[in-house]
């Protein structure tokens, strides 16, 4: 199940990933890593420009484990894309604090897990565009 959702997130079609993740949550609702499952649903929504749904799931992930810097980064991107710049900046600052160092958009591009050109383009148009609006530097 985990491998199937990864294929859908990383090479598409993204919308087909969500049912697999929801099934994982139903099978193991007390999973100690449940925040990651919530995050993955948010990620799928963000890449499809469903910002409200993405925020809902990223906030749920943050509630389950507030110590994950990447959750705060993705939440910052989603808030910025909605025009909620103060909330975006606060989430980006928390991601930086938790990680202990700043990241740049260039670093994120260089280490992306999105290998398929279509998914990489979606990431650029959503996640990275949102982080840029939230204040993450290019270099």
Which role does the model predict for each range below?
Residues 1-139:
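Alpha-helical protein-protein interaction modules
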